[in-house]
Regions:
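Conserved HGGG/HGGXW glycine-rich cap/lid loop of the alpha/beta-hydrolase fold
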Residues: 15-69
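Acidic catalytic loop of the alpha/beta-hydrolase fold
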Residues: 218-222, 248
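Active-site loop/oxyanion-hole signature of alpha/beta-hydrolase fold enzymes
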Residues: 58-99, 260
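Flexible "cap/lid" loop of the alpha/beta hydrolase fold
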Residues: 109, 113-114, 119-151
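Catalytic histidine-centered segment of alpha/beta-hydrolase-like enzymes
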Residues: 246-255
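Conserved alpha/beta-hydrolase catalytic His-Asp/Glu region
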Residues: 149-208
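Short beta-strand/loop motif that positions the catalytic acidic residue
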Residues: 207, 213-215, 219
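Short alpha-helix in the alpha/beta-hydrolase fold that links the catalytic acid
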Residues: 47, 200, 209, 223-232
Length: 270
């Protein structure tokens, strides 16, 4: 018998705004929405595969982050929040618990501030969106590409196309990978550079669902100290202990630990 967690469905869905989004699905059980971090999404991650043992994991790839094409019309944080709302509906994750990372966690919080029913609960891994000039973290775009990868994940092999080994690729494949990396970096930069502050601090009080904040202990992009800042602004927040050995994208460095937190906050039997 085929293990249901090993069967990955990839589909392309149309949003109400006229765009299309690639969605990965695996596992069986209650729906869990998963939003990727800065590296983008090329297929199921280890955390997704873990959670698929008792959830129907549904993970859309946001525009410009891999298998979903770049969308030039997304020029402001408002554009992105509207797009995420449409993507959520099209992917079938509206109202379900979510796991979101980095910039996607920021967008999820922005969405919840104006659409409370967007998700039932959120596990937010290293969310961007706040800024403290006295505790700024490392500027991802002020370091080399190699340093960028190590800032995102201790285990850079988990970053997929963004930092994969190009050996063995032919000329056309090298071009394709290079273009994809450029678009991902440009898209991510548009959301967090030069500053990640789009006024989220003034809207977090509107987030009415439970939020669990998760940080990698070695996150130098959004330092773990920001967890207290987020927790102090959210009406219903739980701050988990920082995960040792994990950088910014803790769900990639510590998939089992993050999956365990998700199960605690969104149990499959609930």
């Amino acid at each position: 018998m085929t293990d249901p967690t090993s069967v990955v469905e990839r589909r392309v869905v149309a949003t109400s705004g006229g765009g299309t989004v690639t969605v990965f699905e695996l596992g069986s059980g209650p729906i869990l929405g998963v939003l990727h971090g800065t590296a983008g999404l090329d297929g199921p991650t280890a955390a997704m595969e873990d959670l698929a043992a008792d959830h129907r994991v549904i993970a859309p790839c946001l525009p410009g982050f891999g298998s979903t094409p770049d969308e030039p019309s997304l020029r402001s944080i408002h554009d992105w929040v509207v797009a995420l709302s449409e993507i959520s509906d099209a992917a079938g994750i509206t109202g379900a618990p979510w796991l979101a990372s980095s910039i996607s966690a920021m967008l999820a919080l922005e969405l919840a501030a104006i659409r409370p029913e967007a998700f039932a609960s959120l596990v937010a891994v290293g969310p961007t969106g706040l800024w403290d000039a006295d505790d700024p973290g490392t500027d991802l775009y002020a370091v080399s590409l190699g340093e960028q990868a190590s800032l995102l994940a201790q285990n850079t092999s988990t970053l997929g196309v963004l930092a994969g080994d190009p050996d063995g690729l032919d000329g056309d494949e090298l071009i394709e990978v290079g273009v994809s990396r450029y678009i991902r970096r440009r898209t991510a930069a548009s959301l967090v550079w030069p500053l990640p502050d789009h006024g989220l601090a003034g809207r977090l009080h509107r987030v009415s669902v439970p939020v669990t904040l998760v940080w990698g202990a070695d996150d130098r992009l959004v330092p773990p100290s920001y967890g207290e800042r987020f927790a102090g602004l959210l009406p219903e927040a739980t701050l988990a202990a920082p995960i040792a050995g994990a950088a910014h994208l803790a769900e990639l460095d510590a998939p089992a630990e993050v999956a365990a937190i998700v199960r605690l906050r969104a149990p499959a039997g609930a």
